[in-house]
Amino acid sequence: MARHSPLYEEHAKAKAHFVDFAGWEMPLHYGSQIEEHHQVRQRAGIFDVSHMGVIDLEGEEATAFLRYLLANDVAKLSDVGRALYTCMLNPQGGVIDDLIVYRVAPTGYRLVVNAATRDKDIAWIKEKGAGYKVSISERPEMCILAVQGPQAIAAAKSIFDEALYAQLEALKPFHFISSPTRDLQIARTGYTGEDGLEIIVPASRATDLWARFVHQGVKPCGLGARDTLRLEAGLNLYGTDMDETTSPLISNLSWTVSWNDADRNFIGRRALEKQLDENVKERLIGLVMEEPGILRNHQKVWLTEDGEGIITSGGFSPTLGHAIALARVPVGEVEKATVERRGKKIPVKIIKPPFVRRGKKTF
């Protein structure tokens, strides 16, 4: 049986078109995926992402444990109220998941993990944390609402009291505020390439909060728009652009691996070092096809001199009005590429992602 978000009835009332996502019945769109995409790029939209997992860690060895568990270094989170993006790797250097970690207390952290991997993630984290003085608790009662777009912060003004709004208005990217009981957490983070907030609240408060944002004119948006927004922003999708068989070094995620402390032997470090010693063989690039047509996942890409690659994420860009894609290709200087469509080779432009930043074309 499919799992439902606590906001399922709200989505049904709004005439959502549902889709199965990792065993969850979630809104794909509420009538027009394209309109929802433009709503976020131009104004503000709200997403229910409560299918994602929330995991709290607490204990005197929580920091030491996460420095071992994660490829990025939580020692960078020098203050409570800061967050970072990281990969969690297996010993072979493959990506078990990508996630955000929040420092909620001097000895406390919160992880937000992907829906498709949440059960696997909690099992892995508990297994690896067994030798550390740390408590690990999944928080299935928490919901996550993402309010995204250039007007997202302004939309929150009438939702929260004056003092709280002043705090969130002053938030820098990857910073957050939370209540003393942690039953309200507001972070300046997102997955759309726009400014915005991600709000974690108990299910008992989520419906009211959702309704108040909608009343302010923030339009509900589904997973379809979320995917086209993240693709335009050049953001990876787990299971598509990387998985347990691919390392961050070939997934445009080298920047999420912290090498600063030579003594920090995080899981997967030796495998990544070996890849570097042997020279990384692949990379992710951006492709743009301005001719009519769609670039699709798993489609082959032919390069002028360095063989062929494969599209990992492809689709139509509503902002640009044509097809874009992320593709994994051999390392090397590549100036031209083609894809096949209806038996013909079609030229595609190679760019460095993102394709869109703050609603504007980047190339």
From Swiss-Prot:
Gene3D superfamilies: Aminomethyltransferase beta-barrel domains (3.30.70.1400), Aminomethyltransferase fragment (4.10.1250.10), Probable tRNA modification gtpase trme, domain 1 (3.30.1360.120). InterPro entries: GCS_T (IPR006223), GCS_T_bac (IPR022903), GCST_C (IPR013977), GCV_T_N (IPR006222), GcvT/YgfZ/DmdA (IPR028896), GcvT/YgfZ_C (IPR029043), TrmE/GcvT_dom1 (IPR027266). GO terms for molecular function: aminomethyltransferase activity; transaminase activity. It is an enzyme of class 2 (transferase). GO terms for cellular component: cytosol; glycine cleavage complex. It catalyses: N(6)-[(R)-S(8)-aminomethyldihydrolipoyl]-L-lysyl-[protein] + (6S)-5,6,7,8-tetrahydrofolate = N(6)-[(R)-dihydrolipoyl]-L-lysyl-[protein] + (6R)-5,10-methylene-5,6,7,8-tetrahydrofolate + NH4(+). GO terms for biological process: glycine decarboxylation via glycine cleavage system. The glycine cleavage system is composed of four proteins: P, T, L and H. This is Aminomethyltransferase.
